[in-house]
Structures are given as C-alpha cells and as structure tokens.
Design a protein with these regions (language model features):
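Cytosol-facing boundaries of transmembrane alpha helices in integral membrane proteins
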Residues: 1-184
Length: 184
C-alpha cells in the first residue's frame, strides 16, 4: 500500500487493520490488500411488464419498467447492547444518480429518492442506508404511549433498497453513478 498524495504512514493494528495517522485529512493510496472484500455493494434488477429481465435483454424494449437497486453492507461489528450481543453495521449512506432521457422514460416514480427534470432529461437520485434498519432494530423498540412516532414508516425511510418505475420506450441507459459514505 502506497500513499500517493502525502507523507502520512500507516501501522497495522492487532486485528490486521491499516491505521493511518491523517489528523482528519483524506488519504489517497494505491495497492492491493489481502482482504479485498468491499464494505458496501449494490445490485440492480430489472422487470419489464412484470417479468424479470437481464440488463442485456431489456435493451431496445418498451413497456412498464421496474428497476430495483439493492444496496448491501458487509461492514459490521459485534457489540454488547443492554447485555446482548448484536451486530451493528457501519452507517453508510449510499446514493445513486442516473440520467434518463425524457424521450425514452416517462411517468418516473421512485420510492426513496427524487426525480428532477431539466427539459431533455430526468435526473434520478436514489438513496439507501444498508444495515441501518437492522442496527436500530426498530421493529422491537417500544417507545411507549407518550411518543407519537410510526416506527414502520421510519423503517421504510431507512431501507437498503430503492424501486424506480417508469414507462419506457426503446430502453437504453447510460452510466449510473453510486457513492457510499460513512462521513456525514
């Protein structure tokens, strides 16, 4: 592992993790680590008129599109909470952006995100927080009668998946861009 934009060095802790002394600054490095599993991931699935289709088979097709983005989080630690061992995930926010031309995509709807139009294109921003719902375990939280919070509604907003629907003509899609951050 080589620092490519500074002089900061790292040490290896008892668990084999690299620890950088960066004083809050970003570190830019290159190299290969023994454990190459990424902390987060994503998968996009497509349905056209209710039938699941592969990305290569949907190109050029028309119909009712349902695109599902499923984010995943492999970064977790086991901690003790109220005397019980629980898996707590690193709280990542993941956001995906895509540009969908108005001449191919119409009636776009998204359950976790926003659709913005600039005339020729719809800009879709989707978000998810993989692992956060499991870490908070809101289904098993009793807030009492004095707290007026719908935990099911809150749980729906901190989901790890996004569903985008649209009427599509001659399907084609350029790149999607996804960013994950635990630094909010």
């Amino acid at each position: 592992i080589k620092n490519v934009k500074g002089n900061e060095s790292y040490t290896v802790d008892a668990d084999g993790n690299l620890v950088w002394n960066a004083d809050g600054s970003d570190i830019y490095y290159q190299g290969t680590a023994e454990n190459s599993e990424l902390p987060v991931g994503m998968q996009i699935t497509y349905k056209l008129d209710g039938e699941e289709v592969s990305p290569k088979d949907i190109v050029g097709k028309s119909g009712k599109l349902e695109m599902t983005i499923k984010y995943s989080n492999a970064s977790k630690k086991q901690v003790t909470v109220a005397g019980e061992k629980k898996d707590i995930y690193t709280p990542f926010l993941m956001a995906t952006g895509m540009i969908l031309p108005v001449d191919k995509f119409d009636n776009i709807d998204i359950d976790n995100g926003k659709v913005l139009s600039e005339g020729e294109n719809n800009i879709v921003i989707a978000y998810g927080m993989p692992g956060l719902s499991e870490s908070l375990d809101l289904k098993n939280v009793d807030l009492g009668d004095d707290v007026d919070v719908d935990t099911d509604e809150l749980n729906d907003k901190i989901t790890d998946s996004v569903k985008i629907t649209a009427d599509v003509k001659d399907f084609s899609m350029s790149q999607t861009y996804t960013v994950a951050t635990a630094d909010l």
